[in-house]
């Protein structure tokens, strides 16, 4: 028996990311969502990696993974932390990264499309084959009602080139630096100039 984990929406402007788990032997499928807030102001902190891991572990628990059951994970970098955590929990011999195709891919994709339709947006039929066209189609939908910005991954640094996003959410490229308090490497949404201390998100909250 094998459980296959895939994602949909990582490269799409709208909504968060759907993560689904599928047991091919029984056609069982379940999914959950990384909230879009992880792709907004805190995007450069990459907290979505830990959230992806949390969701994957929850979905596998929900499917009641059996001893020795193989778990195959999509090759996408969104699962880097999840793979590490899964290997620690279930063993390296159980976990592998694959290119997901077929039924699990279809189910996760359909779940993402259902979620964005729930926002009131109708996706392009050829969205997968025309990613650039889909991006601008989504952006146009947001532009007709700027209140829809709350549904967008506004933390993407590349969006700063578009007036629609820069005027609402001033997006700066993330810079790697050292936290002045704990000494750990962290990313901040500005370029440190050495004139003031810089704190990671954990130390900032303390």
Where are these regions (language model features)?
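Short, non-ligating residues that shape and space the ligands of small metal-coordination modules
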Residues: 187-189
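RNase H-like, Mg2+-dependent phosphodiesterase core
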Residues: 1-181, 191, 195-206
């Amino acid at each position: 028996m094998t459980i296959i984990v895939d994602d949909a929406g990582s490269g799409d402007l709208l909504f968060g990311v759907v993560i689904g788990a599928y047991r091919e032997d029984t056609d069982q499928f379940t999914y959950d969502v990384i909230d879009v807030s992880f792709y907004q102001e805190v995007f450069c902190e990459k907290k979505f990696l830990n959230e992806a891991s949390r969701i994957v572990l929850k979905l596998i628990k929900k499917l009641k993974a059996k001893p020795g059951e193989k778990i195959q994970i999509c090759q996408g970098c969104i699962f880097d932390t999840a793979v590490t955590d899964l290997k620690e929990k279930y063993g390296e011999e159980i976990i592998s990264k694959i290119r997901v195709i077929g039924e699990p891919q279809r189910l996760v994709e359909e779940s993402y499309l259902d979620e964005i339709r729930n926002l009131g947006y109708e996706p392009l039929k050829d969205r997968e084959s025309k990613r650039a066209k889909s991006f601008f189609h989504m952006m146009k939908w947001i532009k007709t009602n700027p209140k829809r910005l709350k549904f967008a991954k506004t933390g993407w640094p590349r969006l700063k080139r578009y007036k629609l996003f820069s005027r609402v959410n001033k997006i700066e490229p993330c810079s790697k630096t050292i936290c002045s308090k704990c000494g750990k490497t962290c990313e901040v949404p500005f370029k440190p100039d050495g004139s003031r201390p810089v704190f990671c998100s954990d130390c900032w909250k303390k």
